[in-house]
């Protein structure tokens, strides 16, 4: 007579079965032309149930032949009293090829996917990377982790006395659901060009770092986005955390003269000035609220367009004084400053744009020339896109679409209008002024023969420990091309170039990027 036969029968069934996971494959990330930016490489881990291994010496020799590790290492592992021990982790398939087809009592082969990034540094801060459990830690990998991850399944297998399992068709199974694939708006070719040119600029200017963005002003699509120093996502532990940040969205800076387009737009839109109005620029020196504001040249009488073209601080401040606080603040907000752009990417900051009630007597002057205001490179690119496309502020986009494993579109980002900043006619006027900047003003080195380029430079002293540094700068350039039918907005930022003189060189370097892009377009 068997007592509690049902209990023993259930225990016997449990001992003869094992539920094993069926791993979902993480979705991949692609550029806008479907070039893969990620890969999933299968890695194998070897383990053993020591009590199930009949001949430990023979077992150790067999494993050693595949891994080239001494058999004694495995014999020591197999001497453990634990029910299960790992022998090797993260082996490539070629290492375990001789083992996979064999039924070896006590051996457990665990298969997992590991993320790989074939283009290493290119686009690394956009793409991000995953942890050992394949969860996204930064970048697109983190922001869209829920789409990429998929859902693991499981299968119940029959296990014999040697611990070897096999599938039985009558046993239950839950298939895995693979992750979705993401297609970005990023063009890998443009991304490579941008990063190469940023690296060249950092070297030439002996700068601390650099940022750059290429954006389609008609759609809000980000074509390229980079920060230097960068990192290799295949070896994230080899670089500082600071290098892993996409600082075009996470870091803010005072833009200096690239912000003057806000004053110009507001002045034209409110009819505060006309193209023929003249302002005396005080021979390059003007005192406001006890602070002396200077120009890079001793300008006298300049028209409104000349003030922007020659980047006169004194002239810009006089326009702002005629304009007033509220219109300047309104158009600054309308251009998207002081608030996040809404891009789907982790860590975006909103910048700094204080309400007018918090302004001092000096603030109107300072804000008009790009001080007392902090922006991100992405905000600057979005603002210049609004000028380029005829007055509409668009939400910037990094993701084109997300597709299920069978190719069905499950998420798509279309161009999204945030607001109209100004009329097409007003933005056409601002564009004409920015073309003059490149042709004859402070941006002459940015010109490309045969193409109309519109752009503006800016330089601001860095604010460190409560004071403005005398010798540390942020230099930046924002512009678009072709000016008569804008296709690309280009923003380049240099962090602490060797001297302020590198601002003019920056324009030339920024449009080397544009020149390369134009050549690519012409050759297609």
Model segments located where?
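Short, amphipathic alpha-helical segments that act as regulatory/interfacial helices
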Residues: 128, 384-388, 523
């Amino acid at each position: 007579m068997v007592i509690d036969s049902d209990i023993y029968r259930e225990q016997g069934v449990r001992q003869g079965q094992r539920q094993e996971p069926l791993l979902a494959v993480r979705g991949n990330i692609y550029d806008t032309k479907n070039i893969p930016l990620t890969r999933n490489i299968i890695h194998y881990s070897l383990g053993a149930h020591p009590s199930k291994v009949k001949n430990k010496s023979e077992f150790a020799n067999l494993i050693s032949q595949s891994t080239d590790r001494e058999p004694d290492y495995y014999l020591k592992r197999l001497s453990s009293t634990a029910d299960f021990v790992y022998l090797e982790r993260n082996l490539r398939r070629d290492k375990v090829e001789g083992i996979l087809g064999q039924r070896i009592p006590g051996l457990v082969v665990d298969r997992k996917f590991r993320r790989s990034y074939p283009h290493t540094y290119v686009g690394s801060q956009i793409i991000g990377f995953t942890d050992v459990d394949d969860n996204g830690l930064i970048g697109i990998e983190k922001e869209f982790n829920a789409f990429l991850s998929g859902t693991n399944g499981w299968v119940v297998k029959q296990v014999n006395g040697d611990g070897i399992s096999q599938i039985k068709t009558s046993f239950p199974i839950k298939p895995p659901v693979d992750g979705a694939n993401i297609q970005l708006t990023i063009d890998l070719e443009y991304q490579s060009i941008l990063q190469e040119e940023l690296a060249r600029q950092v070297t030439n200017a002996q700068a601390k770092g650099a940022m750059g963005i290429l954006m389609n002003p008609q759609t809000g699509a980000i074509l390229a986005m980079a920060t230097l120093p960068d990192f290799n996502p295949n070896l994230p532990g080899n670089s500082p955390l600071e290098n892993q940040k996409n600082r075009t969205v996470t870091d803010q800076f005072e833009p200096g003269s690239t912000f003057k387009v806000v004053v110009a737009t507001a002045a034209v839109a409110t009819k505060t000035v006309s193209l023929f109005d003249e302002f005396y620029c005080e021979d390059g020196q003007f005192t406001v609220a006890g602070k002396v504001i200077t120009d890079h040249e001793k300008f006298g009488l300049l028209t409104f367009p000349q003030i922007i073209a020659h980047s006169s601080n004194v002239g810009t401040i006089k326009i702002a004084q005629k304009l007033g606080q509220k219109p300047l603040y309104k158009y600054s907000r309308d251009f998207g400053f002081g608030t996040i752009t809404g891009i789907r990417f982790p860590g975006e900051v909103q910048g700094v744009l204080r309400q007018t009630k918090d302004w001092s007597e000096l603030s109107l002057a300072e804000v008009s020339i790009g001080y007392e205001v902090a922006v991100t490179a992405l905000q600057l690119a979005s603002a210049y896109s609004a000028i380029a496309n005829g007055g509409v502020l668009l939400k910037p986009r990094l993701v084109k679409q997300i597709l299920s494993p069978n190719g069905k579109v499950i998420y798509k980002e279309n161009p999204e209008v945030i607001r109209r900043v100004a009329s097409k006619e007003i933005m056409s006027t601002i564009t004409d002024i920015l073309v003059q900047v490149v042709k004859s003003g402070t941006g002459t080195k940015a010109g490309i023969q045969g193409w109309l380029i519109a752009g503006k430079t800016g330089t601001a002293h860095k604010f460190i420990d409560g004071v403005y540094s005398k010798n540390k700068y942020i230099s930046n350039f924002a512009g678009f091309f072709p000016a008569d039918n804008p296709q690309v907005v280009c923003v380049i930022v240099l962090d602490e170039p060797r001297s302020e003189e590198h601002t003019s060189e920056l324009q030339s370097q920024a449009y080397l990027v544009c020149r390369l892009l134009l050549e690519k377009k012409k050759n297609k």
